[in-house]
Amino acid sequence: MARLVGVDLPREKRLEIALTYIFGVGRTRAKETLAATGVSPDLRVRDLSDDDLVALRDHIEGNYRVEGDLRREVAADIRRKVEIGTYQGLRHRRGLPVRGQRTKTNARTRKGPKRTVAGKKKAGRK
């Protein structure tokens, strides 16, 4: 298995797809990296030479924040918003959607499983 910036790339996948296993590298950055290093995107990871791996590693580490550095930066940004008391920080603290999504229905991913409130019944019609 080839390792780049601390991530094992799947051997059987095309390089263009395998690079997206790195946190911070999506399809666009993978294509940019392959174009800049001159490595074929159709190459399988198992067929990579050591020179290609070194070129990819140097380009990714030199030009992008990925994996641990990026995760720390995102966590620090969220922590800063919580500390200075912005609306987004408040939403993060309460575990609610941050980017304006509705919460009357849905939002179960952020809110977690439903909690039944005792004594609350649906209003009946007279």
Swiss-Prot record:
Subunit structure: Part of the 30S ribosomal subunit. Forms a loose heterodimer with protein S19. Forms two bridges to the 50S subunit in the 70S ribosome.
GO molecular function, a single term: rRNA binding
Name of protein: Small ribosomal subunit protein uS13
Gene Ontology BP annotations: translation
GO cellular component: cytosol; small ribosomal subunit
Swiss-Prot/TrEMBL keywords: Ribonucleoprotein, Ribosomal protein, RNA-binding, rRNA-binding, tRNA-binding
TM annotation in the entry: none
Annotated stretches, region: Disordered: 92-126
Sequence similarity: Belongs to the universal ribosomal protein uS13 family.
Pfam family, one: Ribosomal_S13
Role summary: Located at the top of the head of the 30S subunit, it contacts several helices of the 16S rRNA. In the 70S ribosome it contacts the 23S rRNA (bridge B1a) and protein L5 of the 50S subunit (bridge B1b), connecting the 2 subunits; these bridges are implicated in subunit movement. Contacts the tRNAs in the A and P-sites.
